Structures are given as structure tokens and as C-alpha cells.
């Protein structure tokens, strides 16, 4: 069985990344209609990734996304929205018969940040996980463009996290 991996960074600024067995990487921003996630289009993206993988390799890719926990400092609205999105992603995997793993952020970050010096948020003692993720991703995927559009100048945090989650799944043989 030849495996591919779909990593999903849940959130309105999240991303969907498909890591093909040959190393090719497809990445999409979580589709939005104004301020709402376009779940129908998101489903279509995942369905297409799954169908192509199944057609080529006669098996489903494995989907990895974050198991949500308490996010200190976030509002009730944000917590509800994230939980809603997580449930929707899980149902997409179930409906498409894609095997999936929900992984706590600290678990995949511990593995993927190996060898990356700790970076702190300016003026604070907290780790800057977005900066550390970008450093890790650039080391693991040299030459990869982490922007999602031609006009973008900054790396897309959601793409970086989704790619690292897919790599975590690949390394763990999920």
C-alpha cells in the first residue's frame, strides 16, 4: 500500500495540504465565503485528493488534523467555531472513508520541532510556534514555496502547519 497524507490546519486561516507518495505537495487555503468556511468546497477539495489517490494507488490517503484542546485567551465564539470546523472535517473523513488521526498540537510539534532552537514571542516568554514551524518546514522541505497565491509575500501559517502535520503522519506510518 502506497500512502499519501492529507494534513489539515483547522481555522479560518487554515489550509489543506496533500503530500503525494512521490513527494509532490498540493496546498489550498481553507475556502471561505466572506467570514464563513465554505464546507461544500472544502469537501470537494478533499474528495478530489482522495479520489486521485485511490485511483492511482488503490487505497485512501491518511488524514491528520489537530485534536483541539483549550486555547487560553480565546473567546467562546472562537472555541465554538474551531470545534464546529473540527467536527465538519471529521465527518468529511468519515463520509469519504478516509482513515484519519486527530493529534494534539503539542504532540506533532514536539516531533517536527526536533533540532529547531526555541523562538519566543517578542517581549514574552511563550514559544512562538508559528515561527518555529516555519523554520522546521524550511529545513524539511527546502525550496518549497509556503505562499498559497502568486501575490502573497508572507508564508501561509496554515499551509506550514498542515504540511508539518502531514509529514508527522508520514513519519509515524499512520
PLM features: residue spans?
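Phosphate- and other anionic-substrate recognition elements at nucleic-acid/protein interfaces
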Residues: 1-174
